[in-house]
Every structure is written in C-alpha cells, then in structure tokens.
C-alpha cells in the first residue's frame, strides 16, 4: 500500500499466492500504521480479483474507506503503484533469492530501511518519504504556532 501524498509504503505482505488474504494483510498493516478516521481514506487499486473480492470490499467498507478502481487493462490509472513496483523490482528483486525467508528479510530491509527512510524522490523535492512527512508536519506546526 502506497501513501500517494508522501510516496511511503505503509502496508505490504508477501506470500506464495495472490489471494484476498494477501491484500488484507497489507491493508491491516497500513491501517495500524496510519490509524485514520472513518471516511478519511481513498483506496485505489487495479481490478485484480483479490481487490474486487466481496470479503475485501466489505473490509474496506467496515473502515469507511472510499473505493476507486482502475479501468480494465489501463495501467496508467494506477501509475504511481506501477512505478513503485517497477522500482522495487529493479532495486531489490532483480535476482533470485535462496529462500522465501531471505526474500522476506531483504524486502523488509528494502522497504522499511531504504525506500521509506532514505530513498530520495524527485516528486518530493529530493526527500525520502519519511523526511517529506517530517518536513510537512514541522511546517504545519510552524504555521499553527504563528497563527
């Protein structure tokens, strides 16, 4: 799950399947991390079966999440996530891993240690997602203290 505002990966999961439980795990991680209020989120995805499933749609509804789905066969509708996945494949998953455990460990290190904390994004003024969020909050606090 990608926070479009800061480009931060806020939820992810890794399994040997693409079933609904996979995206449920990622969503629950994102919700635990962000703790949004009801009706404050928009969830955009492609039309994959795991996202369109009744179970997943009910979970989104239970948290008051607004649902948006790409048009069929149009990757440009989900360009930010497609770009993020392309970056992940190029920078982290460009080789075979000796085991799933090693793959999971390397994915965790990449997402949590590199991508969110240190990888610079031109769209964020060459800040990492965490630096961008920190700067945004500092600027917001500064405005409130002046007002």
Q: What function would you assign to each model-found segment?
A:
Residues 1-147:
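Charged DNA-binding/catalytic regions of mobile-element recombinases
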């Amino acid at each position: 799950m990608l926070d479009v505002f800061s480009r931060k990966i806020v939820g992810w999961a890794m399994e040997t399947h693409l079933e609904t439980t996979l995206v449920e795990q990622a969503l629950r991680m994102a919700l635990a991390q962000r703790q949004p209020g009801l009706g404050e989120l928009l969830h955009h995805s492609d039309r994959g079966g795991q996202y369109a499933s009744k179970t997943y749609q009910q979970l989104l509804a239970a948290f008051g999440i607004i649902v948006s789905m790409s048009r069929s066969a149009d990757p440009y509708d989900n360009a930010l996530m497609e770009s993020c996945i392309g970056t992940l494949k190029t920078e982290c998953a460009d080789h075979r891993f000796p085991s799933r455990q090693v793959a999971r460990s390397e994915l965790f290190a990449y997402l949590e240690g590199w991508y969110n904390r240190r990888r610079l994004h031109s769209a964020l003024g060459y800040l990492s997602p965490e630096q961008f969020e920190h700067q945004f909050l500092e600027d917001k606090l500064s405005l409130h203290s002046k007002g």
